[in-house]
Amino acid sequence: MASALNSKINPPGTCQGSKADGGAGWRMDCDPQMHVKMCKKIAQLTKVIYALNTRQDEAEASMEALREAHQEELQNAVAETKARLLQEQGCAEEEALLQRIQALESALELQKRLTEEALAESASCRLETKERELRVEAEHAERVLTLSREMLELKADYERRLQHLTSHEATPQGRLPQESPETKSEPGQGPEMQEVLLEVQRLRVENQQLSKDYARKAEELQATYERENEAIRQAMQQSVSQALWQWQEKESDLRKNFQVQESALQAQVRKLEGDLEHRGRKISDLKKYAQKLKERIQDLDVQLKEARQENSELKGTAKKLGEKLAVAKDRMMLQECRGTQQTDAMKTELVSENKVLREENDLEAGNLHPQQDQSCLKECPCMKGGTDMQTKKEASAETEYMKQQYEEDLRKIKHQTEEEKKHLKDQLVKRLEDLVKKHTVEIKSVRSSVEAERKKLQREVEAQLEEVRKKSEKEIKQLEEEKAALNVKLQNSLLEVLRLEEFIQQNKTRPTGAEESPQELGRQHCSILETQDPCLKLDETSPRGEEYQDKLAAEEGTSSDEEERTKVLLKEGSDPQPPLGSLLKEKTSKIQRLEEDWQSQKAKLQAQVSQMQQALEQCTSNYREDLQALKQLSDLEREKLQRELQETTQQNHAMKAQLEASHQRALRMLEKARHQELKATEERLKKESSHSLQIQHQTHRLELQALEEKARQELQEERERMQAQQALLLESLRQELSEQQAACSGHQKDLEALQAELRALGRQQASSQCPGDSKDHIIATEERGGPGQAGSPPGAAGQGSGEGCGLWEENAQLQDAVRRLRAEVEQHQQEAQKLRDQRRFLEETQQAQRAREVETLRQEHRKEMQAMVADFSSAQAQLQARLAALEAELKDSGEKPGKGASRPEDLQLIGRLQTRLKEREDIIKQLTEERRFHYAAFPSAMSHRNRSFSFNPHPGYLTPSMKKKKVEDVPSRVVSVPNLASYAKNFLSGDLSSRINAPPITTSPSLDPSPSCGRTYKPNQSTDAKTATRTPDGETAQAKEVQQKQGSPHQEWFTKYFSF
């Protein structure tokens, strides 16, 4: 075991000393390099950590500086916004603007209301005219219906009388054959027959008279209708002209009012626009400033975030690098420990191997010879050299392995660092997105808060403006009340002064009137009371009358004293007469006292009057100043209003021009839209009809193809079956013929063989006889053997003839068989011909059935086309109604034509009414002409019923022959213009709704695939008298259809059809 291990570890040619020296050299070579690399990495990491720390400090300092600047800018912005809001709070013009806007809105509402009233009046007038037209038409229709009914009653009565007379005539004619021939030969024929004939003549005269009366009544009704129509037309023209004149006057008045209002409104609107522009500029400036602040805040926030992110990144990278350094140090320590352990283990192994080798060598040296010892001694250095080389190789391999591991570790570390960088970048991006979202949310919240604050401030400003406005209104009302009170005071003071002057003059003129002094004092007292009452009232109403309350109380006291004195005097006057001296003394003393009191009162009153005058002068001066200020303000407002009026007038003119242009554009657009809609509907209907026709044609073709294929398949199957049968028969016949031919060929061969034998026998007989030799011998021989020889050839000939007969019989049988076969072939041919005839008959029946199916499909197609045309007419009616509604809306929206000119709507209405009247006059004239023609042809068709008064729901179909022609013959194109006969028919039948609706429309031949669609209309000439006397309605309808079939242009019926 030990030798085996030694051989594995130490191969031959190695030595212990070399191995130990190699391991120590490798350790000395590797340790300094690793140490230098580790020192370099540690130095790099320390530099990075120092740089990161310095960057972090700088970022924190810059963040603090940015935060301080941001706070300062925010404080400045808040201060500026507060100052501007405080400045804007003092603006009290918004209320005036709101009032003006309200006034403008009220004026606009009034204008709209007036326009709506005018449009309602116009609509009512139009409705009245339409009602009048409908009423007149209904009355005329009722009259015509009554006349037609009378005529029908007369006709029915006439027919009853004729039937009665014919029945009476029939009874004597039945009795006449029973009478004798003598009575037949009588010339008189009886008085009853003469009476009957007279009655018939009388009835004929009555019928002619009735027809004349009916024609006369119809003419009279026509004349009355024309007169009424003319009167209605004149009245309508007058009413329309009056209504137009009234509408024009109203429009001119309304336009004047509107122009005045528009001028005022335009001025106010311009002023408001200027104010709004000024305020909008202010608001835009504030918004710009706020936006700048927000942008600055955003920039600062972004810088802060970037600095924080850089700081966090630096911290993270520093931490990671520290961790990586620790890991690298641990790895290096572990690698060093492993290397030392490996070198120690190798040293111990080498030492143990050397010891083992030495012991073995010692043992072998004692046993072996000296030669062997020498040889062992020679081999030992070789072994030692081999082991040294092996150890060196192993050390170099281990160093390479260590280097590879180190490089792999470095690569792994780099890969991990790159992955961590990517992960950090992703995290940074996510955090940036989250921060951006948060920042947007914060910005939105800040904006919403700013908007809420702005709205709150605006509301506060509006509330303050409202309060200021209310206060100013209250102050103005108080000033007006004070002004009124002062005016009243002035008037009362002037009255009082005048009364005092009068009283003074009266006292001067009559100083001696002692008796009248009490009365004068009473008057004075009353005047003073009268003057006091308004003064008291004025003091109560006016806020400045508190100064005069004391004076008025003093005056009241003096007046009460005077009243008491006057009462005492009056009492003394009522006493019995005292002595004259005492009376005189008392009177003189009283007069003196009264004079003194009067003078004192006069002085007091003059002082009061002077004070009142001064106060009034002051008040008047104050109010004059106020009035001047108010006049200035009013002048300014007048100027502003005049400017606003001018601006509003200009704006109104511009707006009017714009409105007219827009109205015209709208009308053009509506007309274009209408035409486009009509074209679109027409194209759509054409496309739908063509598409449906194509689909129907395709379905018909597919059905026809399917039927043809089915018939072909059936015929093919029948042919194949018949061919198979014929082929079988022919094969059987061929087999029989081949058998018979084979038999015939066998018989012919037999015949040929027999003929050859006969010829051979004949030749033998000819060769056996010799000419000229011993004729006797020949004769003898003939005599002897002649009968036998002669008997032998006839026997052979009899046999040949029997065989020939048999062959002839067989040939005859074969010929009979051939004849039979020919007869059978002919029979088979006849059967084939019958089958062909049957096939032809089946084909003909199938074609007839197919034609019937095609005819039914065509009829269904025609019905569908009629339904489509009816849908088209209904759609057209809807379009007409829609167009009428659009025109009504346009008319209701109202155009503003020039002054003095009639509106185009009214002119169009008048033109339409005139055209309608002309059309109705033409219809009436044509009806009268048709009636004259009818009554001219009436006596020849007396026994026939008048078809013009038949209540037929289909106006174009009058007679059965005409019905057949209408159903059978198809017109050349779609007729959508209502003819005059159908219109007259509907008019006479009393169906007023049929005038509006179109007549029944026939199908288009261009869409009909039948071959008869291109034929022109040719009326069938019948010998019947009933069909010969056609009504004029049918003739007019035929004439119109013939004209249409002769090819009137497409545009003509289109314009007629779409002329509304």
UniProtKB/Swiss-Prot annotation:
Residue ranges with Polar residues bias: 1-17, 994-1009, 1018-1030
Keywords: Coiled coil
The keyword Coiled coil belongs to this UniProt entry's keyword annotation: yes
Biased composition (Basic and acidic residues): 536-554, 681-690, 773-785
Pfam families linked: FAM184 (PF15665)
InterPro entries: FAM184A/B_N (IPR039478)
Record bears the keyword Coiled coil: yes
Region annotation (Disordered) ranges: 1-24, 165-191, 532-566, 681-700, 762-803, 994-1050
Superkingdom, taxonomy of origin: Eukaryota
Coiled coil: 51-159, 192-333, 402-502, 584-769, 806-934
Family: Belongs to the FAM184 family.
Protein name: Protein FAM184B
Organism: Homo sapiens (Human)
Lineage: Eukaryota, Metazoa, Chordata, Craniata, Vertebrata
